[in-house]
Swiss-Prot record:
PANTHER family: CYTOSOLIC FE-S CLUSTER ASSEMBLY FACTOR NUBP1 (PTHR23264:SF35), NUCLEOTIDE-BINDING PROTEIN NBP35 YEAST -RELATED (PTHR23264). Belongs to the Mrp/NBP35 ATP-binding proteins family. NUBP1/NBP35 subfamily. Residues 1-41 are annotated as: Disordered. This is Cytosolic Fe-S cluster assembly factor NBP35. It comes from Yarrowia lipolytica (strain CLIB 122 / E 150). Its cofactor is [4Fe-4S] cluster. InterPro entries: Mrp-like_CS, Mrp/NBP35_ATP-bd, NUBP1/Nbp35, P-loop_NTPase, YlxH/NBP35. Component of the cytosolic iron-sulfur (Fe/S) protein assembly (CIA) machinery. Required for maturation of extramitochondrial Fe-S proteins. The NBP35-CFD1 heterotetramer forms a Fe-S scaffold complex, mediating the de novo assembly of an Fe-S cluster and its transfer to target apoproteins. Required for biogenesis and export of both ribosomal subunits, which may reflect a role in assembly of the Fe/S clusters in RLI1, a protein which performs rRNA processing and ribosome export. Its main location: cytoplasm. [4Fe-4S] cluster 1 binds at residues 29, 43, 46, 52. GO terms for biological process: iron-sulfur cluster assembly.
Length: 340
């Protein structure tokens, strides 16, 4: 089983010398081999500044390995949110289950929310351990065509806190990309932490050469959530990440008895649809609140399969249909299949 003690060796570009540091890297360390090492704002006052500034620099030797590993992945999709608590990881799990409901598609789910890994619980794979082979780390498979990877599988105890600075998080993300034997995938869904942190910068940097299809941004209707989504959209544009679209999650509650709809989070400024129009990005739809989504996540079940008649399932499947069209993999119409 891979160890959490030292996710990635801190080597120079020759690959055989470790950069000896006087003190642990600061939280926003750009990396000791980065072009910004010793020069970035986070380096000011760091005891390692002189060491990093004088260390040999060069192209990251792992980038070609990542590019080679990602050759077998057709579509890479980031799931982002500006604020925590809007259902980003929940929606990542729904995307994983939804893409995998097409048995002709191979799907991977990568959890880079290093300090808050919740996907193992949501996917019903808590307690599983990562196995290694000559091909690399083996993903944990929750169905025949849906594999996943998370730091949650590497914890000795599920309640253990992960207290890592940026450089160590970045090292693990790099290993998820270059060491995991993803095989040939149609979709790799990447669940990220909220905000714009080291994890976001790392995954966009590491996947730059192999290409990212784009980002799906999750929000809730209220302005407090939209404030942070605006920053997330700005991050995408500055980083050169295409925005596939915006999803408004928990947009309303449909009573299962009277079918009336109540808006739990009032869209005081127009909600996600108005924001999408403001930024001229696609609005993928509104997903109503259904308490059974939480129940399915707690039990590690596929909500869309367990509750196919839910209005939330209809909305989720429509979002998936639009994402597939956006990346050039439109769903085949079931009626057409029957005619054939």
């Amino acid at each position: 089983m891979p160890s959490l003690v030292d996710p990635v060796a801190n080597k120079t570009d020759e690959g055989n010398n470790r950069t000896d540091l006087k003190a642990p890297e600061p939280e926003h360390c750009p990396g000791t081999e980065s072009e910004e090492a010793g020069k970035a704002d986070a380096c000011q006052g760091c005891p390692n500044q002189d060491i990093c500034a004088s260390a040999p620099k060069g192209p990251d030797p792992d980038l070609p390995l990542i590019k080679d590993r990602m050759k077998g992945v057709k579509h890479k999709i980031l799931v982002l949110s500006g604020k925590g608590g809007v259902g980003k990881s929940t929606f990542s799990s729904l995307l994983g289950w939804g893409f995998a409901s097409d048995l002709d598609r191979e799907v991977g789910l990568m959890d880079i929310d290093i300090c808050g890994p919740s996907l193992p619980k949501m996917m019903g794979s808590e307690g599983e351990q990562i196995h290694t082979s000559l091909s690399g780390w083996s993903p944990i498979y929750v169905s025949d065509n849906l594999g996943m990877m998370s730091v949650g599988f590497m914890l000795p105890n599920q309640d253990d806190a992960i207290i890592w600075r940026g450089a160590k998080k970045n090292g693990l993300i790099k290993q998820f990309l270059k060491d995991v034997d993803w095989g040939n995938l149609d979709y790799l869904v990447v669940d990220t932490p909220p905000g714009t942190s080291d994890e976001h910068l790392s995954v966009t940097q590491y996947l730059k050469e192999s290409g990212v299809d784009g980002a799906v941004v999750i929000t809730t209707p209220q302005e407090v959530a939209l404030l942070d989504v605006r920053k997330e959209l700005d991050f995408c544009r500055k980083s050169g990440i295409k925005i596939i679209g915006l999803v408004e999650n928990m947009s309303g509650f449909v009573c299962p008895n009277c079918k009336g709809e109540s808006f739990i989070f009032a869209p005081t400024t127009g909600g996600g649809k108005a924001l999408a129009e403001e930024f001229n990005i696609p609005f993928l739809g509104s997903v109503p609140l259904d308490p059974r989504i939480g129940k399915s996540c707690d039990h590690g079940e596929s909500f869309v399969e367990e509750y196919p008649d839910s209005p939330a399932t209809t909305a989720i499947l429509d979002v998936i249909r639009q994402i597939r069209e956006a990346v050039g993999d439109p769903q085949e119409d079931e009626d057409d299949d029957m005619d054939e």
